UniProtKB/Swiss-Prot annotation:
Pathway: Lipid metabolism; malonyl-CoA biosynthesis; malonyl-CoA from acetyl-CoA: step 1/1. This is Acetyl-coenzyme A carboxylase carboxyl transferase subunit alpha. It comes from Chelativorans sp. (strain BNC1). Keywords: ATP-binding, Cytoplasm, Fatty acid biosynthesis, Fatty acid metabolism, Lipid biosynthesis, Lipid metabolism, Nucleotide-binding, Transferase. Acetyl-CoA carboxylase is a heterohexamer composed of biotin carboxyl carrier protein (AccB), biotin carboxylase (AccC) and two subunits each of ACCase subunit alpha (AccA) and ACCase subunit beta (AccD). It catalyses: N(6)-carboxybiotinyl-L-lysyl-[protein] + acetyl-CoA = N(6)-biotinyl-L-lysyl-[protein] + malonyl-CoA.
Length: 316
C-alpha cells in the first residue's frame, strides 16, 4: 500500500477497493471479480492522471516531501558503480546529512555530493533529515577541491528542507560554510551538474546546487524558504502555507520559465515514489546527456557558470 497524500483520496478509495477484490479472488471463493478489478484499475489510472495533471504548488510541495520518494542514496546505488564515500571535514567531525565521495559513471570517474534524508526513523535521525551542519558543507568543499585537482566532473543531488538551524551549527559557522561551498561550486574548473530530486530549500540547497546545469524533477520544489516559513513571516500564520506556495514560484515549471533551472526531468504519473526505477533511470540519462552537452558546447566551465548566474540576477 502507498502512503497517500490528502489530495489523493479519490485514488486511495479506488485502489483500496481493488485490493479488497484481489484478496477476495485469492481467498478461493467462487466469485469472478476479474472484470470488476480491470474496470476499477482503469478508473484508478484515470483518477491518478487527473489529480497529477492539475497539481497546485502546495500539492507539489507535498509530493516533493513524500516519505517514499527515492532519496540520494537510492540514486547513488542505482546509477553509479564503485562508490567510495569520504567522511569528515578534517576540522570538526562527520555530518551524515551530506553524502560525498567518488564513483564511476558510464565508465568515467565522477565526484558525488548529495543530501540524504533517510527512509525510516533510524536513518532519518542518522542523516538529520537531510539538514546539513557546517561539517557537511565543508566535507562537500573537500570533495569538490579533490575533484577540481584531478579533473573529475561533479554531480550534486539536492534534497533538503534547508541547512540545520541549531545553535551548535551557528556557533561552528553555518553561514560561512554555506557561502564557502557556494563559492567553491562557482569556481570549479570542471563541469558540474545539479539535480533537485525532492526539496531544494534555501541556502542549504544552493550551497551544492550552483552548477553549469541545474535540473529539477517534475514534482520537486526549489525556494528561498519553505512555504510554512514564508507564511509565518508574511502573515504570522503557518497554516497559510498553501497561499505562500502559490505566490513563491517554487515549482520546476515556474523556475524553468524564470530561467533559474535548465530543464525538467519527467516523473511517472503519481510521482517518483510510484516508479522509482523509472525516474532514477531517466535522471541518469539526463546527467549523461548534460555532461555530453557541456563537453561539446562549453569551453570554459567556470566562465559559463559565472555568466549563467549573473544572468539570473539581471533578469529577476
Amino acid at each position: 500500500m502507498y502512503n497517500y497524500l490528502d489530495f489523493e483520496k479519490p485514488v486511495a478509495d479506488l485502489e483500496g477497493k481493488i485490493l479488497e477484490l484481489k484478496k477476495l479472488s485469492e481467498s478461493g471463493e467462487a466469485v469472478d471479480v476479474a472484470e470488476e478489478i480491470s474496470r476499477l484499475e482503469r478508473r484508478s489510472k484515470d483518477a491518478l492522471r487527473d489529480v497529477y495533471r492539475a497539481l497546485t504548488p502546495w500539492q507539489k510541495a507535498q509530493v516533493a516531501r513524500h516519505p517514499d520518494r527515492p532519496h540520494c542514496m537510492d540514486y547513488v546505488r542505482a546509477l553509479f558503480t564503485d562508490f567510495t564515500p569520504l567522511a569528515g571535514d578534517r576540522a570538526y567531525g562527520e555530518d551524515e546529512a551530506v553524502v560525498a565521495g567518488f564513483a564511476r559513471f558510464k565508465g568515467q570517474s565522477i565526484a558525488i555530493v548529495g543530501q540524504e534524508k533517510g527512509n525510516d526513523t533510524h536513518s532519518r535521525l542518522k542523516h538529520n533529515f537531510g539538514m546539513a551542519r557546517p561539517e557537511g558543507y565543508r566535507k562537500a568543499v573537500r570533495i569538490m577541491d579533490l575533484a577540481d585537482r584531478f579533473g573529475i566532473p561533479v554531480v550534486s543531488l539536492v534534497d533538503t528542507a534547508g541547512a540545520y538551524p541549531g545553535i551548535g551549527a551557528e556557533e561552528r559557522g553555518q553561514a560561512e560554510a554555506i557561502a564557502r561551498s557556494t563559492s567553491k561550486c562557482l569556481s570549479l574548473k570542471v563541469p558540474n551538474i545539479s539535480v533537485i530530486i525532492g526539496e531544494g530549500g534555501s541556502g542549504g540547497a544552493i550551497a551544492i546546487a550552483t552548477a553549469n546545469l541545474v535540473y529539477m524533477l517534475e514534482h520537486s520544489i526549489y525556494s528561498v524558504i519553505s512555504p510554512e516559513g514564508a507564511a509565518s513571516i508574511l502573515w504570522h500564520d503557518s497554516t497559510r502555507a498553501k497561499d505562500a506556495a502559490t505566490n513563491m514560484k517554487i515549482t520546476a515549471q515556474d523556475l524553468l520559465q524564470l530561467k533559474v533551472i535548465d530543464g525538467i526531468i519527467p516523473e511517472p504519473v503519481g510521482g517518483a515514489h510510484r516508479a522509482s526505477d523509472v525516474v532514477i533511470r531517466t535522471t541518469g540519462e539526463t546527467i549523461e546527456n548534460g555532461f555530453r552537452e557541456l563537453a561539446e558546447k562549453v569551453g570554459d566551465f567556470r566562465e559559463q557558470r559565472r555568466e549563467k548566474f549573473l544572468a539570473i540576477g539581471r533578469s529577476l
